[in-house]
Amino acid sequence: MHIFDYSFLDEGLLPAEIVNLTATITAFNAISDTRKESNKSIYTELEKIARVQSVKGSNAIEGIVTTDARIKQIVDGDSAPLNHDEREIAGYRDALDEIHSKHDQMSFSENMILHIHETMTNLAGYELSGKYKTEDNLIMEIDERGRRRVRFTPVSAADTGEAMQQLVLAYMDARDNPKINKLLLIPCVILDFLCIHPFSDGNGRVSRLLSLFLLYKSGYDVGKYVSFEEQINDSKDFYYEALQESSIGWHTNENSYFEYMKNFLSMLYKCYKELDKRFSTVNGKKLKKTERVEQTVLNSVLPVSKAEICDILPDVSPSTVEAVSYTHLRAHETLANL
């Protein structure tokens, strides 16, 4: 069985790119904490947008989709889910809301992980909701010719309970080591969780919820204001490449966590960049309203819709947003579904 050991994070032999990304993210986080105290209304608006984008993005990665209008209605509680996909979406909403609102009261444990899975899958009627898999599973991919191949063989169902116990204990041991940067520990734990693949379904979505939770516990709350899940969805090919690279040799303890760590930190860095740009745009009171609309779109890392612009800039009317030259904005290929 794989040995869960994060002591390499204490050895000071990390790639320069990882060290630099960590330092930059830490600096961004400090700036955000300072801004948040004196700009609560702005952060409240950003939180509303991120909540919808997180539910949409995390489910879209798994092919669980509906219209943008329906997602917003479900996330805002304005409509009950109408089909299986919408029940999956509503379940993710419930689990996400619990992490956002109750992370201070929760601890990383097997019971917590099982509870998050149960909350996420309960509405969709999963037979094994909140329970580990009872049969072995495989991670497969389909090539352009429709042929399947095994991408990774997770831990067997028989060994899943022990593996999850060892994962949690290894996390606790590393978390309590003052020489280990907690931010670097998170992607290592998430990679191991995905290699165990403890559930019959929902592992990817649970991994993203756990990422947000562990970020909260380590003092990083950017995922509340910019969707971490949507960043992954926007670059999912690179995400899966990093995941595969870091899982090679996992069962024999010969894998390297570095590629997945770099990908995780890069996504987090993009979240902070997006937060910084959105804050600067919303806070740019000296700009004309049309200029603020343009800056919102052009500074956005991800495509942004008209409705989202109106949410980001609540003092700008929808008619003003529509009056902006979309021809100019489309040239930058960042405006989505106006």
What does each of the following model-derived ranges do?
Residues 335-337:
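N-terminal low-complexity segments that are often proline-rich with Ser/Thr-Pro
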Residues 1-333:
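FIC/Doc superfamily catalytic core
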